[in-house]
Amino acid sequence: MSYFPWLTIIVVLPIFAGSSIFFFPHRGNKVVRWYTICICLLELLLTTYAFCYHFQLDDPLIQLEEDYKWINIFDFHWRLGIDGLSIGPILLTGFITTLATLAARPVTRDSRLFHFLMLAMYSGQIGSFSSRDLLLFFIMWELELIPVYLLLSMWGGKKRLYSATKFILYTAGGSIFLLMGVPGMGLYGSNEPILNFETSANQSYPLALEIIFYFGFLIAYAVKSPIIPLHTWLPDTHGEAHYSTCMLLAGILLKMGAYGLVRINMELLPHAHSIFSPWLMIVGTIQIIYAASTSSGQSNLKKRIAYSSVSHMGFTIIGIGSITDTGLNGAILQIISHGFIGAALFFLAGTSYDRIRLVYLDEMGGIAIPMPKIFTMFSSFSMASLALPGMSGFVAESVVFWGIITSPKYLLMPKILITFVMAIGMILTPIYSLSMSRQMFYGYKLFNVPNSYFLDSGPRELFVSICIFLPVIGIGIYPDFVLSLSVDKVEAILANYFYK
Protein backbone atom coordinates (compact mmCIF):
# COMPACT_ATOMS: atom_id res chain seq x y z
CA MET A 1 0.00 0.00 0.00
CA SER A 2 1.31 3.44 -0.98
CA TYR A 3 0.80 6.35 1.42
CA PHE A 4 2.07 8.92 -1.05
CA PRO A 5 -0.77 11.39 -1.87
CA TRP A 6 -1.01 10.48 -5.53
CA LEU A 7 -4.63 11.49 -5.99
CA THR A 8 -4.26 14.86 -4.25
CA ILE A 9 -1.38 15.73 -6.56
CA ILE A 10 -3.34 14.55 -9.60
CA VAL A 11 -6.38 16.66 -8.60
CA VAL A 12 -4.65 19.91 -7.63
CA LEU A 13 -1.75 19.94 -10.13
CA PRO A 14 -3.69 21.26 -13.16
CA ILE A 15 -5.42 24.19 -11.44
CA PHE A 16 -2.35 25.25 -9.44
CA ALA A 17 -0.02 24.92 -12.41
CA GLY A 18 -2.59 26.75 -14.52
CA SER A 19 -2.66 29.66 -12.07
CA SER A 20 0.99 30.39 -12.85
CA ILE A 21 0.06 31.09 -16.49
CA PHE A 22 -1.05 34.60 -15.49
CA PHE A 23 2.51 35.41 -14.33
CA PHE A 24 4.00 34.61 -17.73
CA PRO A 25 5.44 37.58 -19.64
CA HIS A 26 3.50 38.72 -22.72
CA ARG A 27 5.57 36.94 -25.35
CA GLY A 28 2.88 35.49 -27.55
CA ASN A 29 0.69 32.44 -27.21
CA LYS A 30 3.25 29.77 -28.06
CA VAL A 31 4.80 29.60 -24.58
CA VAL A 32 1.39 29.39 -22.88
CA ARG A 33 0.19 26.72 -25.29
CA TRP A 34 3.23 24.48 -24.88
CA TYR A 35 3.28 24.98 -21.11
CA THR A 36 -0.35 23.83 -20.89
CA ILE A 37 0.32 20.81 -23.10
CA CYS A 38 3.32 19.86 -20.92
CA ILE A 39 1.19 20.12 -17.75
CA CYS A 40 -1.48 17.89 -19.31
CA LEU A 41 1.15 15.35 -20.41
CA LEU A 42 2.77 15.37 -16.95
CA GLU A 43 -0.64 14.87 -15.34
CA LEU A 44 -1.47 12.00 -17.70
CA LEU A 45 1.90 10.32 -17.05
CA LEU A 46 1.50 10.69 -13.26
CA THR A 47 -2.00 9.22 -13.44
CA THR A 48 -0.87 6.31 -15.58
CA TYR A 49 2.11 5.59 -13.32
CA ALA A 50 0.03 5.69 -10.12
CA PHE A 51 -2.61 3.37 -11.59
CA CYS A 52 -0.10 0.93 -13.11
CA TYR A 53 2.05 0.50 -10.01
CA HIS A 54 -0.30 1.20 -7.10
CA PHE A 55 -3.70 -0.11 -8.26
CA GLN A 56 -4.76 -3.77 -8.02
CA LEU A 57 -7.27 -4.68 -10.73
CA ASP A 58 -8.71 -7.69 -8.88
CA ASP A 59 -9.53 -5.67 -5.74
CA PRO A 60 -13.05 -4.15 -5.83
CA LEU A 61 -12.38 -2.03 -2.74
CA ILE A 62 -11.31 1.60 -2.74
CA GLN A 63 -7.60 2.06 -3.38
CA LEU A 64 -5.12 4.94 -3.12
CA GLU A 65 -7.31 6.26 -0.30
CA GLU A 66 -6.60 9.67 1.22
CA ASP A 67 -8.49 11.18 4.14
CA TYR A 68 -7.47 14.55 5.57
CA LYS A 69 -9.48 16.71 7.96
CA TRP A 70 -10.18 19.92 6.10
CA ILE A 71 -12.78 22.10 7.91
CA ASN A 72 -13.23 21.23 11.59
CA ILE A 73 -16.48 23.12 12.18
CA PHE A 74 -18.28 21.05 9.53
CA ASP A 75 -16.28 17.87 10.13
CA PHE A 76 -15.46 18.15 6.43
CA HIS A 77 -12.80 15.79 5.08
CA TRP A 78 -10.73 15.77 1.91
CA ARG A 79 -11.48 12.16 0.96
CA LEU A 80 -10.19 10.72 -2.28
CA GLY A 81 -10.00 7.17 -3.61
CA ILE A 82 -10.44 5.19 -6.80
CA ASP A 83 -11.86 1.83 -7.77
CA GLY A 84 -12.68 0.00 -10.97
CA LEU A 85 -15.60 2.33 -11.66
CA SER A 86 -13.59 5.56 -11.59
CA ILE A 87 -10.26 4.54 -13.12
CA GLY A 88 -11.62 4.44 -16.69
CA PRO A 89 -13.24 7.92 -16.65
CA ILE A 90 -10.14 9.41 -15.00
CA LEU A 91 -7.83 8.05 -17.71
CA LEU A 92 -10.34 9.17 -20.37
CA THR A 93 -10.33 12.68 -18.86
CA GLY A 94 -6.55 12.91 -18.98
CA PHE A 95 -6.36 11.60 -22.54
CA ILE A 96 -9.11 13.79 -24.02
CA THR A 97 -8.03 16.95 -22.16
CA THR A 98 -4.46 16.59 -23.42
CA LEU A 99 -5.66 16.22 -27.02
CA ALA A 100 -8.20 19.06 -26.61
CA THR A 101 -5.36 21.33 -25.46
CA LEU A 102 -3.42 20.38 -28.57
CA ALA A 103 -6.54 21.00 -30.67
CA ALA A 104 -6.92 24.51 -29.20
CA ARG A 105 -3.92 25.83 -31.13
CA PRO A 106 -6.02 28.22 -33.31
CA VAL A 107 -7.23 30.06 -30.18
CA THR A 108 -5.17 33.25 -29.90
CA ARG A 109 -7.47 35.72 -28.11
CA ASP A 110 -6.92 35.81 -24.32
CA SER A 111 -4.85 32.66 -24.64
CA ARG A 112 -3.69 32.65 -21.02
CA LEU A 113 -7.22 32.73 -19.61
CA PHE A 114 -8.40 30.11 -22.11
CA HIS A 115 -5.71 27.60 -21.16
CA PHE A 116 -6.14 28.28 -17.44
CA LEU A 117 -9.86 27.51 -17.74
CA MET A 118 -9.10 24.23 -19.50
CA LEU A 119 -6.75 23.21 -16.67
CA ALA A 120 -9.25 24.31 -13.99
CA MET A 121 -11.92 22.21 -15.70
CA TYR A 122 -9.42 19.32 -15.73
CA SER A 123 -9.03 19.49 -11.93
CA GLY A 124 -12.79 19.63 -11.36
CA GLN A 125 -13.43 16.59 -13.52
CA ILE A 126 -10.66 14.48 -11.98
CA GLY A 127 -11.87 15.54 -8.53
CA SER A 128 -15.44 14.49 -9.30
CA PHE A 129 -14.36 11.03 -10.43
CA SER A 130 -12.05 10.45 -7.43
CA SER A 131 -14.11 12.00 -4.59
CA ARG A 132 -15.16 9.70 -1.74
CA ASP A 133 -17.14 12.36 0.13
CA LEU A 134 -20.58 13.68 -0.83
CA LEU A 135 -19.77 17.33 -0.11
CA LEU A 136 -16.40 17.14 -1.87
CA PHE A 137 -18.13 15.51 -4.83
CA PHE A 138 -20.57 18.43 -4.97
CA ILE A 139 -17.76 21.00 -4.77
CA MET A 140 -15.84 19.33 -7.61
CA TRP A 141 -19.08 18.95 -9.57
CA GLU A 142 -19.59 22.72 -9.37
CA LEU A 143 -15.92 23.61 -9.88
CA GLU A 144 -15.98 22.69 -13.56
CA LEU A 145 -19.19 24.64 -14.32
CA ILE A 146 -17.60 28.10 -14.18
CA PRO A 147 -14.76 27.27 -16.61
CA VAL A 148 -17.26 25.77 -19.07
CA TYR A 149 -19.48 28.86 -18.85
CA LEU A 150 -16.54 31.19 -19.54
CA LEU A 151 -15.20 29.01 -22.35
CA LEU A 152 -18.63 29.13 -23.97
CA SER A 153 -19.35 32.83 -23.46
CA MET A 154 -15.92 34.12 -24.53
CA TRP A 155 -14.78 31.74 -27.28
CA GLY A 156 -17.96 30.73 -29.06
CA GLY A 157 -20.09 31.60 -32.07
CA LYS A 158 -22.55 34.43 -32.64
CA LYS A 159 -25.08 33.08 -30.12
CA ARG A 160 -22.47 32.15 -27.52
CA LEU A 161 -24.00 34.25 -24.72
CA TYR A 162 -27.41 32.67 -25.24
CA SER A 163 -26.00 29.13 -25.22
CA ALA A 164 -23.74 29.85 -22.22
CA THR A 165 -26.65 31.31 -20.24
CA LYS A 166 -28.84 28.34 -21.14
CA PHE A 167 -26.06 25.95 -20.06
CA ILE A 168 -25.54 27.60 -16.69
CA LEU A 169 -29.29 27.84 -15.98
CA TYR A 170 -29.81 24.15 -16.68
CA THR A 171 -26.75 22.89 -14.81
CA ALA A 172 -27.08 25.26 -11.85
CA GLY A 173 -30.78 24.41 -11.61
CA GLY A 174 -29.95 20.71 -11.50
CA SER A 175 -27.22 21.34 -8.94
CA ILE A 176 -29.77 22.84 -6.53
CA PHE A 177 -31.29 19.37 -6.15
CA LEU A 178 -27.81 17.93 -5.58
CA LEU A 179 -27.11 20.59 -2.96
CA MET A 180 -30.34 19.77 -1.10
CA GLY A 181 -29.76 16.02 -1.24
CA VAL A 182 -26.15 15.99 0.02
CA PRO A 183 -26.79 17.49 3.52
CA GLY A 184 -30.07 15.56 3.72
CA MET A 185 -28.25 12.25 3.31
CA GLY A 186 -25.37 13.35 5.52
CA LEU A 187 -27.49 14.51 8.45
CA TYR A 188 -30.12 11.74 8.42
CA GLY A 189 -30.21 9.88 11.73
CA SER A 190 -27.28 11.79 13.20
CA ASN A 191 -26.37 15.24 14.49
CA GLU A 192 -22.90 14.80 13.03
CA PRO A 193 -22.76 14.92 9.20
CA ILE A 194 -21.81 11.54 7.70
CA LEU A 195 -20.67 12.29 4.18
CA ASN A 196 -18.19 9.59 3.19
CA PHE A 197 -19.42 7.11 0.59
CA GLU A 198 -18.59 3.94 2.55
CA THR A 199 -20.69 4.92 5.58
CA SER A 200 -23.52 6.22 3.39
CA ALA A 201 -23.59 2.94 1.47
CA ASN A 202 -24.33 1.08 4.72
CA GLN A 203 -26.96 3.61 5.84
CA SER A 204 -30.60 2.55 5.54
CA TYR A 205 -33.30 5.11 4.81
CA PRO A 206 -37.11 4.92 4.84
CA LEU A 207 -38.19 4.01 1.32
CA ALA A 208 -40.10 7.27 0.77
CA LEU A 209 -37.07 9.34 1.82
CA GLU A 210 -34.74 7.23 -0.33
CA ILE A 211 -36.99 7.83 -3.35
CA ILE A 212 -36.92 11.59 -2.69
CA PHE A 213 -33.10 11.57 -2.49
CA TYR A 214 -32.89 9.44 -5.62
CA PHE A 215 -35.21 11.66 -7.65
CA GLY A 216 -33.37 14.84 -6.62
CA PHE A 217 -29.99 13.42 -7.59
CA LEU A 218 -31.48 12.01 -10.80
CA ILE A 219 -32.52 15.49 -11.95
CA ALA A 220 -28.97 16.79 -11.44
CA TYR A 221 -27.47 13.88 -13.39
CA ALA A 222 -30.19 14.00 -16.07
CA VAL A 223 -29.09 17.52 -16.98
CA LYS A 224 -25.44 16.51 -17.34
CA SER A 225 -25.90 13.13 -19.06
CA PRO A 226 -28.20 14.44 -20.65
CA ILE A 227 -31.50 12.58 -20.28
CA ILE A 228 -34.58 13.81 -22.14
CA PRO A 229 -36.36 16.17 -21.63
CA LEU A 230 -33.48 17.99 -19.86
CA HIS A 231 -31.21 17.80 -22.91
CA THR A 232 -32.09 20.96 -24.82
CA TRP A 233 -29.03 22.91 -23.61
CA LEU A 234 -26.68 20.46 -25.32
CA PRO A 235 -27.31 21.15 -29.05
CA ASP A 236 -27.16 24.92 -28.50
CA THR A 237 -23.98 24.61 -26.46
CA HIS A 238 -22.22 22.37 -28.97
CA GLY A 239 -23.44 24.51 -31.85
CA GLU A 240 -21.72 27.63 -30.48
CA ALA A 241 -18.68 26.35 -28.54
CA HIS A 242 -15.15 26.17 -29.95
CA TYR A 243 -14.41 22.62 -31.00
CA SER A 244 -11.75 22.10 -28.30
CA THR A 245 -14.45 22.92 -25.73
CA CYS A 246 -16.84 20.57 -27.56
CA MET A 247 -14.26 17.79 -27.16
CA LEU A 248 -14.29 18.29 -23.39
CA LEU A 249 -18.09 18.49 -23.26
CA ALA A 250 -18.78 15.41 -25.38
CA GLY A 251 -15.79 13.41 -24.17
CA ILE A 252 -15.97 14.04 -20.42
CA LEU A 253 -18.75 16.34 -19.17
CA LEU A 254 -21.63 14.15 -20.38
CA LYS A 255 -20.00 11.14 -18.71
CA MET A 256 -20.06 12.79 -15.29
CA GLY A 257 -23.85 12.50 -15.14
CA ALA A 258 -23.80 8.78 -15.92
CA TYR A 259 -20.96 8.28 -13.43
CA GLY A 260 -22.90 10.06 -10.67
CA LEU A 261 -25.97 7.97 -11.45
CA VAL A 262 -23.96 4.78 -10.82
CA ARG A 263 -21.74 6.05 -8.01
CA ILE A 264 -24.40 7.69 -5.83
CA ASN A 265 -27.88 6.65 -6.97
CA MET A 266 -27.12 3.03 -7.77
CA GLU A 267 -24.49 2.35 -5.09
CA LEU A 268 -25.89 4.36 -2.17
CA LEU A 269 -29.65 4.13 -2.89
CA PRO A 270 -30.20 0.56 -4.16
CA HIS A 271 -33.87 0.17 -3.18
CA ALA A 272 -34.92 3.35 -4.96
CA HIS A 273 -32.84 2.35 -7.98
CA SER A 274 -34.73 -0.96 -8.19
CA ILE A 275 -37.97 1.03 -8.34
CA PHE A 276 -36.73 3.60 -10.85
CA SER A 277 -34.80 1.21 -13.11
CA PRO A 278 -37.78 0.26 -15.35
CA TRP A 279 -38.41 3.96 -15.95
CA LEU A 280 -34.74 4.49 -16.79
CA MET A 281 -35.02 1.69 -19.36
CA ILE A 282 -38.11 3.28 -20.92
CA VAL A 283 -36.62 6.79 -20.98
CA GLY A 284 -33.33 5.48 -22.40
CA THR A 285 -35.17 3.66 -25.18
CA ILE A 286 -37.25 6.74 -26.06
CA GLN A 287 -34.08 8.83 -25.97
CA ILE A 288 -32.35 6.63 -28.55
CA ILE A 289 -35.26 6.90 -31.00
CA TYR A 290 -36.07 10.57 -30.35
CA ALA A 291 -32.50 11.90 -30.59
CA ALA A 292 -31.66 9.78 -33.65
CA SER A 293 -34.82 11.00 -35.41
CA THR A 294 -34.18 14.62 -34.45
CA SER A 295 -30.54 14.42 -35.54
CA SER A 296 -31.58 13.59 -39.10
CA GLY A 297 -33.47 16.89 -39.33
CA GLN A 298 -30.59 19.11 -38.19
CA SER A 299 -28.86 21.17 -40.88
CA ASN A 300 -26.17 22.42 -38.48
CA LEU A 301 -23.29 19.91 -38.49
CA LYS A 302 -22.36 20.31 -34.83
CA LYS A 303 -25.98 20.13 -33.68
CA ARG A 304 -26.42 16.91 -35.63
CA ILE A 305 -23.41 15.40 -33.85
CA ALA A 306 -24.78 16.72 -30.52
CA TYR A 307 -28.10 14.91 -30.99
CA SER A 308 -26.18 11.75 -31.91
CA SER A 309 -24.44 12.07 -28.52
CA VAL A 310 -27.83 12.26 -26.79
CA SER A 311 -28.91 9.12 -28.66
CA HIS A 312 -25.79 7.17 -27.74
CA MET A 313 -26.06 8.14 -24.08
CA GLY A 314 -29.45 6.39 -24.14
CA PHE A 315 -27.57 3.07 -24.27
CA THR A 316 -25.73 4.04 -21.09
CA ILE A 317 -29.02 4.83 -19.31
CA ILE A 318 -30.50 1.48 -20.40
CA GLY A 319 -27.40 -0.41 -19.23
CA ILE A 320 -27.60 1.26 -15.81
CA GLY A 321 -31.31 0.44 -15.57
CA SER A 322 -30.85 -3.23 -16.49
CA ILE A 323 -29.38 -4.11 -13.04
CA THR A 324 -27.16 -6.85 -14.48
CA ASP A 325 -23.40 -7.31 -14.47
CA THR A 326 -23.37 -7.38 -18.26
CA GLY A 327 -25.63 -4.35 -18.70
CA LEU A 328 -23.73 -2.16 -16.23
CA ASN A 329 -20.36 -3.17 -17.69
CA GLY A 330 -21.77 -2.31 -21.12
CA ALA A 331 -22.87 1.11 -19.85
CA ILE A 332 -19.37 1.81 -18.50
CA LEU A 333 -17.86 0.63 -21.79
CA GLN A 334 -20.25 2.93 -23.69
CA ILE A 335 -19.14 5.85 -21.48
CA ILE A 336 -15.52 5.28 -22.51
CA SER A 337 -16.32 4.46 -26.14
CA HIS A 338 -18.50 7.48 -26.78
CA GLY A 339 -16.00 9.69 -24.97
CA PHE A 340 -13.49 8.93 -27.73
CA ILE A 341 -15.90 8.92 -30.69
CA GLY A 342 -17.84 12.06 -29.71
CA ALA A 343 -14.66 14.05 -29.05
CA ALA A 344 -13.20 12.97 -32.41
CA LEU A 345 -16.30 13.90 -34.42
CA PHE A 346 -16.45 17.38 -32.90
CA PHE A 347 -12.72 17.86 -33.48
CA LEU A 348 -13.00 16.93 -37.15
CA ALA A 349 -16.12 19.08 -37.58
CA GLY A 350 -14.17 22.00 -36.09
CA THR A 351 -11.11 21.50 -38.28
CA SER A 352 -13.39 21.39 -41.33
CA TYR A 353 -14.99 24.66 -40.24
CA ASP A 354 -11.54 26.27 -39.87
CA ARG A 355 -10.98 25.59 -43.57
CA ILE A 356 -14.32 26.11 -45.30
CA ARG A 357 -16.01 28.47 -42.78
CA LEU A 358 -19.33 26.68 -43.25
CA VAL A 359 -21.37 24.93 -40.56
CA TYR A 360 -24.64 24.15 -42.38
CA LEU A 361 -24.74 20.86 -44.24
CA ASP A 362 -26.84 22.16 -47.13
CA GLU A 363 -24.05 24.64 -47.95
CA MET A 364 -21.33 21.97 -47.99
CA GLY A 365 -20.42 19.31 -50.50
CA GLY A 366 -17.47 17.96 -52.43
CA ILE A 367 -14.76 18.52 -49.81
CA ALA A 368 -13.59 14.89 -50.01
CA ILE A 369 -11.54 15.78 -53.11
CA PRO A 370 -9.47 18.67 -51.68
CA MET A 371 -9.35 17.21 -48.13
CA PRO A 372 -8.99 13.41 -48.39
CA LYS A 373 -7.37 12.95 -44.96
CA ILE A 374 -10.20 14.70 -43.13
CA PHE A 375 -12.66 12.72 -45.25
CA THR A 376 -10.98 9.42 -44.31
CA MET A 377 -10.86 10.15 -40.58
CA PHE A 378 -14.40 11.58 -40.41
CA SER A 379 -15.78 8.58 -42.30
CA SER A 380 -13.92 6.21 -39.96
CA PHE A 381 -15.35 7.83 -36.84
CA SER A 382 -18.81 7.94 -38.42
CA MET A 383 -18.54 4.17 -38.88
CA ALA A 384 -17.51 3.84 -35.23
CA SER A 385 -20.50 5.97 -34.21
CA LEU A 386 -22.95 3.72 -36.07
CA ALA A 387 -21.45 0.69 -34.29
CA LEU A 388 -19.46 -0.93 -37.09
CA PRO A 389 -18.12 -4.35 -35.96
CA GLY A 390 -14.49 -4.16 -34.92
CA MET A 391 -14.91 -0.76 -33.28
CA SER A 392 -15.68 0.18 -29.69
CA GLY A 393 -19.26 1.35 -30.32
CA PHE A 394 -20.30 -2.06 -31.61
CA VAL A 395 -18.92 -3.88 -28.57
CA ALA A 396 -20.46 -1.44 -26.06
CA GLU A 397 -23.93 -1.53 -27.59
CA SER A 398 -23.82 -5.31 -28.01
CA VAL A 399 -22.91 -5.79 -24.34
CA VAL A 400 -25.81 -3.51 -23.30
CA PHE A 401 -28.15 -5.54 -25.54
CA TRP A 402 -27.02 -8.76 -23.91
CA GLY A 403 -27.42 -7.24 -20.44
CA ILE A 404 -31.08 -6.44 -21.15
CA ILE A 405 -31.84 -9.86 -22.62
CA THR A 406 -30.30 -11.70 -19.65
CA SER A 407 -31.82 -9.46 -16.94
CA PRO A 408 -33.95 -11.53 -14.50
CA LYS A 409 -35.69 -8.39 -13.20
CA TYR A 410 -37.89 -7.94 -16.27
CA LEU A 411 -40.43 -10.19 -17.99
CA LEU A 412 -39.72 -11.58 -21.44
CA MET A 413 -42.15 -9.40 -23.40
CA PRO A 414 -40.89 -6.03 -22.03
CA LYS A 415 -37.32 -7.15 -22.75
CA ILE A 416 -38.21 -8.10 -26.33
CA LEU A 417 -40.05 -4.79 -26.82
CA ILE A 418 -37.17 -2.67 -25.47
CA THR A 419 -34.64 -4.63 -27.55
CA PHE A 420 -36.78 -4.19 -30.67
CA VAL A 421 -37.11 -0.42 -30.18
CA MET A 422 -33.36 -0.13 -29.51
CA ALA A 423 -32.72 -2.00 -32.75
CA ILE A 424 -34.86 0.56 -34.60
CA GLY A 425 -32.69 3.28 -33.05
CA MET A 426 -29.57 1.53 -34.31
CA ILE A 427 -31.12 1.49 -37.81
CA LEU A 428 -31.77 5.25 -37.59
CA THR A 429 -28.13 5.90 -36.65
CA PRO A 430 -26.70 5.09 -40.12
CA ILE A 431 -29.39 7.28 -41.68
CA TYR A 432 -28.25 10.50 -40.00
CA SER A 433 -24.58 9.49 -39.89
CA LEU A 434 -24.19 8.50 -43.54
CA SER A 435 -26.34 11.38 -44.80
CA MET A 436 -24.09 13.75 -42.83
CA SER A 437 -21.00 12.33 -44.55
CA ARG A 438 -22.72 12.46 -47.95
CA GLN A 439 -23.73 16.10 -47.59
CA MET A 440 -20.26 17.12 -46.40
CA PHE A 441 -17.92 15.20 -48.64
CA TYR A 442 -19.68 14.06 -51.81
CA GLY A 443 -20.80 16.07 -54.84
CA TYR A 444 -18.99 18.99 -56.47
CA LYS A 445 -20.51 22.04 -54.78
CA LEU A 446 -17.40 23.46 -53.09
CA PHE A 447 -14.96 21.87 -55.48
CA ASN A 448 -16.43 23.88 -58.36
CA VAL A 449 -16.28 27.23 -56.55
CA PRO A 450 -13.93 29.57 -58.50
CA ASN A 451 -10.49 29.96 -56.89
CA SER A 452 -11.41 27.45 -54.17
CA TYR A 453 -8.42 25.92 -52.42
CA PHE A 454 -8.63 24.13 -49.09
CA LEU A 455 -5.69 22.77 -47.14
CA ASP A 456 -6.01 19.17 -46.00
CA SER A 457 -5.39 17.97 -42.46
CA GLY A 458 -1.96 18.94 -41.14
CA PRO A 459 0.32 16.91 -38.84
CA ARG A 460 -1.36 18.25 -35.69
CA GLU A 461 -4.88 17.33 -36.76
CA LEU A 462 -3.72 13.96 -38.08
CA PHE A 463 -1.91 13.21 -34.81
CA VAL A 464 -4.99 14.04 -32.68
CA SER A 465 -7.27 11.96 -34.93
CA ILE A 466 -4.99 8.92 -34.92
CA CYS A 467 -4.48 9.13 -31.14
CA ILE A 468 -8.26 8.88 -30.65
CA PHE A 469 -8.76 6.29 -33.39
CA LEU A 470 -6.28 3.79 -31.91
CA PRO A 471 -8.21 3.19 -28.64
CA VAL A 472 -11.49 3.01 -30.61
CA ILE A 473 -10.06 0.15 -32.67
CA GLY A 474 -8.25 -1.35 -29.65
CA ILE A 475 -11.39 -1.53 -27.52
CA GLY A 476 -13.35 -2.90 -30.48
CA ILE A 477 -10.87 -5.74 -30.94
CA TYR A 478 -10.10 -6.38 -27.26
CA PRO A 479 -12.87 -4.93 -25.02
CA ASP A 480 -11.49 -6.66 -21.91
CA PHE A 481 -8.91 -3.88 -21.89
CA VAL A 482 -11.68 -1.69 -20.38
CA LEU A 483 -14.05 -4.32 -18.98
CA SER A 484 -11.33 -5.83 -16.77
CA LEU A 485 -11.11 -2.52 -14.90
CA SER A 486 -14.74 -2.48 -13.79
CA VAL A 487 -15.94 -6.09 -13.64
CA ASP A 488 -15.10 -6.71 -9.96
CA LYS A 489 -16.51 -3.37 -8.81
CA VAL A 490 -19.72 -3.97 -10.78
CA GLU A 491 -20.19 -7.32 -9.02
CA ALA A 492 -19.71 -5.61 -5.65
CA ILE A 493 -22.32 -2.94 -6.49
CA LEU A 494 -24.90 -5.47 -7.69
CA ALA A 495 -24.40 -7.64 -4.59
CA ASN A 496 -26.83 -5.24 -2.86
CA TYR A 497 -29.64 -6.07 -5.29
CA PHE A 498 -32.14 -8.90 -5.20
CA TYR A 499 -32.03 -9.15 -8.99
CA LYS A 500 -28.68 -10.15 -10.43
From Swiss-Prot:
Annotated GO MF terms: NADH dehydrogenase (ubiquinone) activity; ubiquinone binding
Q: List the disulfide bonds.
A: none
What is one term from the GO cellular component aspect held by the record?
chloroplast thylakoid membrane
* Compartments it resides in: Plastid, Chloroplast thylakoid membrane
Keywords per UniProt: Chloroplast, Membrane, NAD, NADP, Plastid, Plastoquinone, Quinone, Thylakoid, Translocase, Transmembrane, Transmembrane helix
Tell me, in one coarse class, where this protein mainly resides. plastid
Biological process annotations from GO: ATP synthesis coupled electron transport; electron transport coupled proton transport
The reply to whether Oxidoreductase figures as a keyword in the UniProt entry is no
Looking at the record's lineage, which domain of life comes first? Eukaryota
E.C. no: 7.1.1.-
Q: Which reaction does it catalyse?
A: a plastoquinone + NADH + (n+1) H(+)(in) = a plastoquinol + NAD(+) + n H(+)(out); a plastoquinone + NADPH + (n+1) H(+)(in) = a plastoquinol + NADP(+) + n H(+)(out)
Identify its membrane topology class: Multi-pass membrane protein
Q: Could you list the residue ranges that cross the membrane?
A: 4-24, 37-57, 84-104, 111-129, 134-154, 167-187, 208-228, 242-262, 272-292, 305-325, 330-350, 374-396, 416-436, 462-482
Q: Which family does it belong to?
A: Belongs to the complex I subunit 4 family.
PANTHER family in the cross-refs: NAD(P)H-QUINONE OXIDOREDUCTASE CHAIN 4, CHLOROPLASTIC, NADH-UBIQUINONE OXIDOREDUCTASE CHAIN 4
The entry's protein name is NAD(P)H-quinone oxidoreductase chain 4, chloroplastic
The species this protein belongs to is Liriodendron tulipifera (Tuliptree)
Gene (UniProt): ndhD
